[in-house]
């Protein structure tokens, strides 16, 4: 791992996302891309009506731009070997970013439907889950095509365990959980971004 490039990439990601926030949030307010709050629940939730939505666009843009910059920095410094292991690691990293973009697209469509319909329901939960499962399946398929067929997971202090075919189920559920964790815990207005 190239520590300087990783630190630069993380700082760049934070900076880009914060800068985009200063630009995007007022623009979203001006465009009236606000969240509609349900009538059920405490009365004080109504004060959040109209809070800008689609904030995930800032995070996705920050990740993609900083990832590209990090790859460019590592390539320019000779840290990326495009033969063998280096190219396989790069392919895996790119597939992870593409997966994040695809999840971001699902969130964008969900928010867009909410804004267009002026209601708090976008995609149906089952529609989101099906799309997310297909994205995860495409992610795993890209790894298998790239030659990464390992089903071993390393647990700190415990060692390595080979999950066999259950690897895809465990990891798939883990990814699905992480993608939906904020939505499940936010509950009020879906605006944790």
Functional labels for PLM-detected ranges:
Residues 1-193:
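"…together with the soluble PPM/PP2C metallo-phosphatase catalytic core" -> "…together
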């Amino acid at each position: 791992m190239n520590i300087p490039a990783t630190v630069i990439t993380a700082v760049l990601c934070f900076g880009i996302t914060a800068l985009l926030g200063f630009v995007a949030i007022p623009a979203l307010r001006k465009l009236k891309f606000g969240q509609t709050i349900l009538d059920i629940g405490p009365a004080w939730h109504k004060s959040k009506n109209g809070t800008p939505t689609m904030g995930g666009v800032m995070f996705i843009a920050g990740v993609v731009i900083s990832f590209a910059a990090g790859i460019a920095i590592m390539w320019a410094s000779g840290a990326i070997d495009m033969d063998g292991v280096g190219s396989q690691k790069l392919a895996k990293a790119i597939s992870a970013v593409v997966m994040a973009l695809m999840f971001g697209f699902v969130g964008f469509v969900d928010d867009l439907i909410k804004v267009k319909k002026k209601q708090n329901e976008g995609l149906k939960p089952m529609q989101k889950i099906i799309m997310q499962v297909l994205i995860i399946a495409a992610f795993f398929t890209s790894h298998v095509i790239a030659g990464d067929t390992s089903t071993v997971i390393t647990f700190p202090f415990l060692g390595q365990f080979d999950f066999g075919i259950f690897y895809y189920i465990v990891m798939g559920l883990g990814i699905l959980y992480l993608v939906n964790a904020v939505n499940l815990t936010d509950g009020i207005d879906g605006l944790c971004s």
